From Swiss-Prot:
Main location: secreted
Tissue expression summary: Expressed by the venom gland.
Any one cellular-component term (Gene Ontology): extracellular region
Protein name: U1-cyrtautoxin-As1c
Purpose of the protein: Insecticidal neurotoxin with probable ion channel impairing activity. In vivo causes a rapid, irreversible flaccid paralysis that results in death.
Places the protein is found: Secreted
Free-text comment on this protein's domains from its UniProt entry: The presence of a 'disulfide through disulfide knot' structurally defines this protein as a knottin.
A GO MF label: ion channel regulator activity
Pfam entry (one): Cys_Knot_tox
Annotated S-S bridges: 23-37, 30-51, 36-66, 69-76
Length: 76
């Protein structure tokens, strides 16, 4: 199985969410995009951060994980 590129190498801002928890980094399990950390310089349209459905070969089911990607690349 080829591992998914979830954007863990893209710098992101680790901030506290309104619910008091820290935002989730690329690869963390999530239930909505608002939980995911945004890429640094997210005021530009270069990067997108969202909660995405991914196949987990280890668990043999779909899971939701935070993902950050460059919107101009094919990885998004």
């Amino acid at each position: 199985e080829i591992p998914q590129n979830l954007g863990s190498g893209i710098p992101h801002d680790k901030i506290k969410l309104p619910n008091g928890q820290w935002c989730k980094t690329p690869g963390d399990l999530c239930s909505s995009s608002s939980e995911c950390c945004k890429a640094k310089h997210s005021n530009s349209v270069t990067y997108a951060s969202f909660c995405s459905r991914q196949w987990s070969g280890q668990q043999a089911l779909f899971i939701n994980q935070c993902r950050t990607c460059n919107v101009e690349s094919s990885m998004c």
